């Protein structure tokens, strides 16, 4: 995880996995994604009982945070694949969860397009955060 690379542009919106993984707890779950060659290509964390719970009408949500793709593996489909597999992963390991929420920086149009492609919807809500204004997006999971 120490060799994970992010560009300066990526670091405007996210953090290194090595920093985020230190927050791991029974409610903050780091997720690492590997390709077929066993290279770490994507990282994110899923958090229960999070600060964005008030921005959804669903009672059981996970917050998707710190999503990134190692710069050496950008534009190869790994981020899309990881997000498209997420509902099945959550159904298996968190069957009580009914939605996934995230906050994406309003200036990060690349990430917004990715999340939209993967069926996340703009909730219309905006939140002021450490690195700027966040657009709250949500993916409602079918049961």
Language-model regions, residue ranges each:
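Active-site acidic-Proline motif in GNAT/NAT acetyltransferases
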Residues: 70-76, 106-107
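Conserved beta-strand segments that form the floor/walls of ligand-binding pockets within enzyme
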Residues: 63, 68, 101-103, 136
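Short glycine-rich hinge loops at helix-strand junctions in the catalytic core
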Residues: 77, 94-95, 119
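Short beta-strand element of the conserved SAM-dependent methyltransferase core
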Residues: 33-34, 135-139
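Solvent-exposed beta-strand sheet faces enriched in polar/charged residues
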Residues: 47, 101-103, 123
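Acetyl-CoA-dependent GNAT
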Residues: 2-66, 70-72, 83-84, 89-93, ...
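Conserved active-site alpha-helix within GNAT-family acetyltransferase domains
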Residues: 80, 106-124
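Conserved beta-strand-loop-alpha-helix junction that forms the acyl-donor binding cleft
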Residues: 96-112, 128-133, 140-141
